[in-house]
Amino acid sequence: MTEEERLLSAASQEAEASIEKSLRPQFLAQYIGQDKVKQELTIYIEAAKNRNEALDHTLLYGPPGLGKTTMAMVIANEMNVNIRTTSGPAIERAGDLVAILNELEPGDVLFIDEIHRLPRVVEEMLYSAMEDFYIDIMVGQGTTAHPVHFPLPPFTLVGATTRAGMLSAPLRDRFGIISHMEYYQEQDLKEIVLRSADIFQTEIFEEGAFEIARRSRGTPRIANRLLKRVRDFAQVQSDGKIDRAIADKALTLLQVDHQGLDYVDQKLLKTMIDLYGGGPVGLSTLSVNIGEETETVEDMYEPYLIQKGFIKRTPRGRIATPFAYAHFGYDYLEGRKN
């Protein structure tokens, strides 16, 4: 199974792009959750507007699906400026970056998603652009080559990354604002589901929204995806209204349990417990047993299971925790004996 095929994937899926756009809040007052980030940005944006300056360069980092792209667009709206969006892999050469920078107006926001994937030559050109608002490029070849100085208007670079540790120190140090996007609380996710249902013109009860929220892995993108699937179920199997019972039936049909675990998550944990006494068990052995590539297990399944406390990584392999045993109604001490 690929990341794009998985219902509980936090990665953006191409088919969802237009729907995600319709669900995005436009301003900080509409943005649900991430209170610390919002409070800080409110101050920084207001101060920059009072001084009639561009906002400091801003780095947004955290797991996928938490609203980094949306926050970049909100920043541009709050500053009342245009935004140009691109991604690290899309800027292959220094010339690509020059073309983008030359289109910016004073105060504009340049949003670079997956900024940790910028080629080194492009990243190094960004240093002077971010710090002093100019770039130097070499024109000509051989003995006729000479640098050409291009001044740039003051602008705000908003970078987004799921892997802040992969950013080089020189690039990271040039961001004046660094904000960590965290997993959402269930109450905030419930409010997001209610808001999205209203946009979809779908009638939903609070307990139905909460049932979706608590199975959404703390991630708005997953919550909205599950809402769409539950909406389909409600329209075909019921009267179109989503209450707790309908949400539970739909999500159970989709094999998403109350902790947000899907079929493969459950299979992985049960394999560790039933076949290997809870571990330790090696990653390659686990992968063979559940029929997935080792990279898929490590990148797609393990992070959430570790974050929620279902498994632990040790030098000898993976171990199922008491929480994992309890989730399936197993006795931990008895299971470890076996």
From Swiss-Prot:
GO cellular component terms attached to this protein's record: cytoplasm; Holliday junction resolvase complex
Head domain (RuvB-H), as annotated region: 258-338
- Entry keyword annotation includes 4Fe-4S: no
Q: Where is this region: Large ATPase domain (RuvB-L)?
A: 1-184
GO molecular function annotation: ATP binding; ATP hydrolysis activity; four-way junction DNA binding; four-way junction helicase activity
Classification via SUPFAM superfamilies? P-loop containing nucleoside triphosphate hydrolases, Winged helix' DNA-binding domain
| Catalytic class of the enzyme | hydrolase
Q: Which parts of the sequence are annotated with region: Small ATPAse domain (RuvB-S)?
A: 185-255
| Assigned keywords, A-Z | ATP-binding, Cytoplasm, DNA damage, DNA recombination, DNA repair, DNA-binding, Hydrolase, Nucleotide-binding
GO BP field: DNA recombination; DNA repair
Catalysed reaction equations from the record: ATP + H2O = ADP + phosphate + H(+)
The entry's DNA-binding residues are R313, R318
- UniProt free text on domains: Has 3 domains, the large (RuvB-L) and small ATPase (RuvB-S) domains and the C-terminal head (RuvB-H) domain. The head domain binds DNA, while the ATPase domains jointly bind ATP, ADP or are empty depending on the state of the subunit in the translocation cycle. During a single DNA translocation step the structure of each domain remains the same, but their relative positions change.
The similarity comment for this entry is:
Belongs to the RuvB family.
Self-association or partners: how does it assemble? Homohexamer. Forms an RuvA(8)-RuvB(12)-Holliday junction (HJ) complex. HJ DNA is sandwiched between 2 RuvA tetramers; dsDNA enters through RuvA and exits via RuvB. An RuvB hexamer assembles on each DNA strand where it exits the tetramer. Each RuvB hexamer is contacted by two RuvA subunits (via domain III) on 2 adjacent RuvB subunits; this complex drives branch migration. In the full resolvosome a probable DNA-RuvA(4)-RuvB(12)-RuvC(2) complex forms which resolves the HJ.
Protein's name in the database = Holliday junction branch migration complex subunit RuvB
Q: Which organism is it from?
A: Enterococcus faecalis (strain ATCC 700802 / V583)
Q: Which gene carries the instructions for this protein?
A: ruvB
